[in-house]
Amino acid sequence: MAYKFAKRMNNIKASEIRELLKLTQRPEVISFAGGLPAPELFPVQEVKEVAAEVIEEQGTNALQYAPTEGYDPLREKIAKRMEKFGVNVTKNNILMLSGGQQGLDFSGKIFLDKGDVVLCESPTYLGAINAFKAYEPNFVEIPTDDNGMIIEELEKIIETTDKVKLIYVIPDFQNPSGRTWSVERRKKLVEVANKHDIVIVEDNPYGELRFEGELPPAIKHFDTEGRVVYLGSFSKTFCPGFRLGWACADEKLLNKYILVKQGADLQTNTTAQMILNKFLDKYDLDEHIEKIKEVYKKRRDLMINTMKEAFPKEVKFTYPEGGLFTWAILPEHINARKLAEKAIENNVAFVPGGSFFPNGGNENTMRLNYSNMTEDRIVEGIKRLGKAIKEMM
């Protein structure tokens, strides 16, 4: 049959990461490709316990439809947790999402018409690129350094670019670079957005996974005009399979997200929300996060130290203070996609960095995940990857 697809489908491509993950299902593959949490850290017994209690106590309520906004006790707890990022809100500023990724799709649907401009970090999250592409915007990449987006460059581009509708950023342990914005850059970003009347989407799934240093305030902390939409997630701090995230925004703006969610999936999973809420009642999530951070810090250190030994000195890489990823820049003559093909032949996988640049280029970069593999596999995988790089030098 000749299906008559909408023209927008021409802009929607398979995620390179999702396709790569299919290859990594083989047990012999050492995968640094996905942004996967360590499954051995999932609180399986605790979830089993509280899930039974939820069904026992809530009965049919846990299995029924619920309000689009989400389960009120959980929304209240999230509003309280936002205080650690310097954001003072109530449950009325919180909308439960089916994962933080849903908030990206909703942001595109709410703000973007064909030809509108999205300003983003260079590089930026592949999942956001794919979510926004369905709405046919133009992407303009803003240069970054170790302190985040270079605000002077941002303002120059805003002043010479028409139809800027959205600034999309990941200020904490950015995916893919692992970098974190300075407090000064966060403050200045809001000042620029206020001056030019532009909405900011702040995506922060990794912010609580800080291994060292002080927790900086969210960009939302500096928002005095209600123009910052903050997207949070429990996928990296609890369990990704529950698909639980949230949007935090000014009530007038959040109402648009509620309307869009009603048309998308009516509501976020009731049972999952109640299980998480019960978990938060009975257990200390911050204590659980400390255990995650301890393991990830050890794995980050091991990966970085092994890279220093196994990679040619010409390869540069970031040293993230938290999160899940480090970012490597190869000599310009090495194509990371070709390196990935060579690596997979040796049962090692990573994501070529070119996928994280919406306008292409930068084919000599790669993203490496350190959270998912055990220590021995990290060492062996980096050694294999280093050998493959040396063969291409």
Give a label for each model feature.
Residues 56, 61-197, 201, 207-225, ...:
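Conserved core of the PLP fold type I
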Residues 1, 345, 359-393:
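PLP-dependent enzyme catalytic core of the Aspartate aminotransferase-like
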Residues 253, 328-367, 380:
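Conserved C-terminal alpha-helix-loop-beta "cap" of PLP-dependent enzymes
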Residues 277, 294-304, 316-329, 342:
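Conserved glycine-rich beta-strand-loop-beta hairpin in the small C-terminal domain of fold type I
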